[in-house]
Amino acid sequence: MIAEPPVIDTPCAGRRRASPVHELTSLLAHAANYDLWPHFGRALLRRLPFAKQQDRRHERQMRGRCDEAAIDTESALRRLGISGPVLHLCRRFPEIWAAGQRQVEKCPIPFQELGIAGAANVELLHYLCRHLRAHRVLETGVALGWSSLAILLAISEGSGARLHSVDLPYTRLRATRWVGIVVPPELKGLWTLHRMADREGLPRALADGPFDLCHYDSDKSAAGRLWAYPRMWEALRPGGFLISDDIGDNHAWRTFCAQVGREPVVVHSGLKLVGVLVKA
């Protein structure tokens, strides 16, 4: 049998910052929704000049430190115990992936332009879920649903498997119907989508633990991460994986790794950096 070609990291354009107009309309939309008032208050605090300057200073420092330790996706999978050929998911599931792309092409909402749809490392998520024979998985951040699809394809053969996803409603974009649009109907029976901010949605999702894998890709602030990481870590089973996107943004990932006394695997993912921790 001819070996399948290895994974090659997919380039991405990086995470764009939303324009001031989009940020303002987002805040106004959240203010008009009573259920989102707690998130609205936290978002206002993060937009204070001091908070922004502090995060940007930490981003420059942490990016350099994480870059030094980063490896490619295939090397990371090997280090985490996965052997054998690894394919891009668009090759492993060509029909499902193409169908998802067709759904994206119908979407009138400029997700990427607004900085809320940076692609997750779907190969990393998929193959780690398969390696764990994951039964319960938790993620924050959905957008169009590529990470959700990668996870659902990995757990779909397990009896009673479930993915819990937490994602803030995109009120300003009238985009509710497009969240998770790439997930096909036949996989939605394994999926629970909590349309809430992390601090309201995560406690609900965590009630279905323990989890085999937790993936964080939502609130990028240090405060938001340092609130969520310990709760996700506590909900992980021994041997489970905590994965976080964009770990070079600020000090939160390194701070948390030091708190739990674990050394992460750092992965290059296009222009982003992804961190993986294994729970002992």
Located regions from the model:
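N-terminal acidic, proline/glycine-rich, low-complexity intrinsically disordered segments
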Residues: 1-7
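N-terminal auxiliary segments of SAM/dcSAM-dependent transferases
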Residues: 8-90
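S-adenosylmethionine/decaboxylated-SAM
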Residues: 8-15, 20-27, 111-280
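Short charge-dense sequence patches
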Residues: 67-80, 94-105, 176-184, 203-208
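Class I SAM-dependent transferase core
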Residues: 79-121, 126-131
